[in-house]
Each structure stands twice: as C-alpha cells, then as structure tokens.
C-alpha cells in the first residue's frame, strides 16, 4: 500500500504542479489579455479623443468662419444702409438747395421787376407833373363820341378867334 500511497502522493504532487502551472499560464494569459484589452481601450480612447478633438476643431473653425461671414454680411448691410441713408440725405439736401435756389432766383427776378415797375411809375409821375405844368392843369376827357377839356378849379375859359382858329383863353 505504500506504493499506492506513494503513487497517490506523486499524482497529487504532479496534479498540484500542473494546477500551479495552469494557474500561472492562465494568469499570464489573463494578464496579457488584460494588457491587450487595456491597450486596445487606450488606443480606442485616444482615437475617439482625437476624433472628438478634430470634430470640435472643425466645428469651431466652421463656426468661426460662419461668424466672420455673418459679421461681414452685417457690416456690408450696415454700409449699404449708411450709403442709402447718405444718398437719401444728399438727395434731400440737393432738393432743398434747388428749392432755395429757385425761390431765391424767383424772388430776385420779381424784386428786379418790382424795382423796374417802381422806376417806370416814378418816371410817369414826373412826366405827368411836367405835362400838368405845361397844360396848366387842363385835362382832356373823352366820353364815347364827345370830347371835353376840363379846367382846373378856380379857372374860367374864354374862346378867342386867333390866326384862323379858335383859342381858349384861361382866366383866374
């Protein structure tokens, strides 16, 4: 029996060695598998992180371009609005200037005409005074087919034949 015990002890020893060897091998394999999985996860994590960073950078760049485009469009719109307002203002100023110029020209022309008319009236009054002085205030009036000589107040007339014509002599 001792042989059997010895064989059993050897078998148990071999089984124990084999179990330890299998355990070591499995531990090594699990460790390598863990390292491989960890490496793969780290690699994927890096790839995902890089992809996210690239997407974020691309999105930020696109967003910045969009912002600049919108900003430029707004500035262009602002310039267009200011240009339109400036053109409208200049057109209004031009119209006001033309109205003032036309009004001033009209007033200047009418002022000249009034001045000329006043000068003409003054000349006519002088001529009338000269005529009144020469005619001693006698006026000629025509009423239809009849003609009259009107004497000034305080004067009387006497008809005198002279040189083949009838003359009117004024008396006071």
Curated annotation (Swiss-Prot):
Q: Name one Pfam family in it.
A: MbeB_N
UniProt-listed InterPro entries: MbeB-like (IPR006922)
Give the residue spans that cross the bilayer: none
Q: Which domain of life is it from?
A: Bacteria
Record has Transcription as a keyword: no
**What keywords tag this UniProt record?**
Conjugation, Mobility protein, Plasmid
| Oligomer status and interactors | Interacts with MbeA and MbeC to form the relaxosome.
| UniProt record similarity statement | To E.coli MbaB and MbkB.
What biological function has been recorded for the protein in this entry?
A: This protein is essential to promote the specific transfer of the plasmid in the presence of conjugative plasmids.
This chain belongs to which protein, by name?
Mobilization protein MbeB
